[in-house]
Amino acid sequence: MESKSEQNEWSSGVWAHLTAVRQQSPLVQCITNFVSMDLVANTLLSAGASPAMVHSVVEIPDFTPHIHALCVNVGTLTPDWLPSMKAAAELASQLRKPWVLDPAAVSCSGFRLKACLELIELKPTVIKGNGSEIIALSSASRGQTKGADSSHESTDAIEAAKSLAMSSGAVVAVSGAVDIVTDGKQVIGVHNGTKMMQQITATGCSLAGLIVAFLAIDSSRVLEATVSAMAVFGIAGELGEAMANGPASLRMHLIDCLYGLDETTVLKRVNVTRLG
Amino acid sequence: MESKSEQNEWSSGVWAHLTAVRQQSPLVQCITNFVSMDLVANTLLSAGASPAMVHSVVEIPDFTPHIHALCVNVGTLTPDWLPSMKAAAELASQLRKPWVLDPAAVSCSGFRLKACLELIELKPTVIKGNGSEIIALSSASRGQTKGADSSHESTDAIEAAKSLAMSSGAVVAVSGAVDIVTDGKQVIGVHNGTKMMQQITATGCSLAGLIVAFLAIDSSRVLEATVSAMAVFGIAGELGEAMANGPASLRMHLIDCLYGLDETTVLKRVNVTRLG
Amino acid sequence: MESKSEQNEWSSGVWAHLTAVRQQSPLVQCITNFVSMDLVANTLLSAGASPAMVHSVVEIPDFTPHIHALCVNVGTLTPDWLPSMKAAAELASQLRKPWVLDPAAVSCSGFRLKACLELIELKPTVIKGNGSEIIALSSASRGQTKGADSSHESTDAIEAAKSLAMSSGAVVAVSGAVDIVTDGKQVIGVHNGTKMMQQITATGCSLAGLIVAFLAIDSSRVLEATVSAMAVFGIAGELGEAMANGPASLRMHLIDCLYGLDETTVLKRVNVTRLG
């Protein structure tokens, strides 16, 4: 059982992170998919960050040096977008800016899997996926070709996440009924969030964007910043669902709640535990 | 006048189709336009289907064999997207997976009209458009070049729809004040829906996506599955409008209502008639 | 102090413009960024206009001659989109159709700044940006390379806007706490709107789209039509914020309010002053 003081520590850390995002309004570059651009941008704005959906390879040398952190999401990947993603990721890594890889639907093609493995070579700070995506990536990173099974629950993905974290050097975040965050040694569970959030497209991408904003303001504590972002997004979803009649109103209330989230609510609702 | 037993048959068919979509959660690949990706995905999710917005030509050989059905929408067509659409459509036809063509704004250019005619050669299961689009396609299929007049009501388009259905082998669905579905012989009218739905961008595209999901779970009864999808979408719009203050809240309530639609409401509200 | 009769003149002008948009439903072509396509289209629909998100360079010769006005927004510019923007802008100028340039994030790269300067050569009717964007463009138009500082308030941008208007021949609109519209001589302030609108992505792009619709129905009075569009959008935002719990519900209510805006409300709320 989690000690009360440790739970309090997580809670106050989450609130400190959210406050810092609101105060510093980090500039977050997103190279994300077409489906999620709108919701990712609105998620970041409602959290207090400054999103910039800049994806042209010709703009990266000028723009990426000015950002605080980067999000790369392969959800609607085509070959012409990959050079931009690589250029931005490489530059971010060189300049020691944190960046997150969201390997959305990584198993849908050999092309996409290969692209994600190449992006992992560029040293993402965090890899954020669902259970199936993390299992597929972890297997492929070990040279295995077993396909992903989308029925994997995130808790089943713990070993895959730890393995991927060890081999890649990234913190790995797995969204699911219980969100998992691991650096390969520690395993943290985030129990916030609701099932209906999965009925809204682009919530996973938006969570990845939010993690980027939190990394931007605490890049030395990657595991903790990632946990904080997942807890904040989950709490906004819980509050939103209490007001919602279905997924579309949940989507609206989630963003409103993220915007209005206050200290009392955060401290009361953060539900984070050590799983290993 | 429609017999009561025939109306009951349509109603119970609509409910059976919706239930099957929810239970089977078919995987629906959408190659659609930039404007509609978000709403199409959320419409499919709220109906219980699994949308996948995969459009890269390099991913189609790996991915399309795993889908249950395909949606192709030319709303923001550029020459570089057409090969993907053709490759996916051709593969879907080969593998006997149903696919829907939405010839959005087909008359806006010679390029787009030609592209749609080429796609029709690949044997769509259903062609879904508004009256103007269907009239333009039907004329062009007969070698006529008369431009479309956007003032055509869907009921005026019946003859064009029948002709296009006969020449293409597709079931043709025409959205409008009364939705029309025809296989070239039978003509069915779907009287559900509200006028304000036309004030929301991408509702037509979302309806096309929904038809795909319904075809996925009953591909042997194309006419009936198409009617069911149109009735369900229309009913969700009616329920949504009763709660809405304008098009943006209608959009939200429509998705929520689609998600929550129950048997009693479906059986009571389905309004389908034989027109010929 | 503004005379009451002058204020009344602005108010009745705004209402006359909105009424004309609703009655004439102008066809507005938008070549805009991926993030904003959905909201721009819904803004135009809710105002009574007909949006068409047609951006392929191969479609412009067929399509652009039929439009009433054009919107060009560089928010997610890549080199392959620029020829379309130029072709459409050039054709619009040739055919004396009004067009608006939204130089979104113009300072994010040398490529984007150069593209905007080239587009300005094609004689936009209106250039709409925030203070930083207008200052950056104005400096660059004078051959200066000083970067934009995003902390500039729109009122600080008056001189830059006047200078850009004089050099380009366009009316320049600057969104901010007080919106500014100038033809280089007259300077008009629009005091409608709320701060929270900046927490929603694509509101600036949507305002640009709305200006296009208003130009379409009164192309001979560019300054006045631009002021009207900004006042209408601002009023919709004020009404929306009164009903909102955060940015996502504001976004919904804004569109609903734009759709339902009536004469009494417009006449009462328009807040326009001469600043110079």
UniProtKB/Swiss-Prot annotation, chains A, B, C:
Induction: Not regulated by thiamine or 4-methyl-5-(2-phosphonooxyethyl)thiazole. Keywords: ATP-binding, Kinase, Magnesium, Metal-binding, Nucleotide-binding, Thiamine biosynthesis, Transferase. Transmembrane segments: none annotated. Its EC number is 2.7.1.50. It holds the Pfam family HK. Pathway: Cofactor biosynthesis; thiamine diphosphate biosynthesis; 4-methyl-5-(2-phosphoethyl)-thiazole from 5-(2-hydroxyethyl)-4-methylthiazole: step 1/1. InterPro entries: Hyethyz_kinase, Ribokinase-like. Coiled coil: none annotated. Its cofactor is Mg(2+). Disruption phenotype: No visible phenotype. Disulfide bonds: none annotated. The keyword Disulfide bond does not apply. It catalyses: 5-(2-hydroxyethyl)-4-methylthiazole + ATP = 4-methyl-5-(2-phosphooxyethyl)-thiazole + ADP + H(+). Substrate binds at residues 53, 202. GO terms for molecular function: ATP binding; hydroxyethylthiazole kinase activity; magnesium ion binding. GO terms for biological process: thiamine biosynthetic process; thiamine diphosphate biosynthetic process; thiamine salvage. It is an enzyme of class 2 (transferase). Thiazole kinase involved in thiamine salvage pathway. Belongs to the Thz kinase family. This is Hydroxyethylthiazole kinase. It comes from Arabidopsis thaliana (Mouse-ear cress).
